[in-house]
């Protein structure tokens, strides 16, 4: 049995390849009102899902973008996540 290598969704910009990911992350929840102990204990972070190309991943941050210029090295729809908030990264297959 010959196993095929997985092909992942990616783009090439200025000779650099960027891969498309599903990013699952914990979002901070804040409330400036008064609350009881019971209400406070019920607070939880929101589990968020974002999709984008990974621009850079370091020990401290994950940088993503979702839009780009087809003729220039220019990025839009950008996000930067603290790595401590990242729960899961999934590379998207074609």
Listing of model-derived features with the role each one plays in the protein:
Residues 2-94:
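Conserved RNA-binding domains used in RNP assembly and mRNA/RNA metabolism
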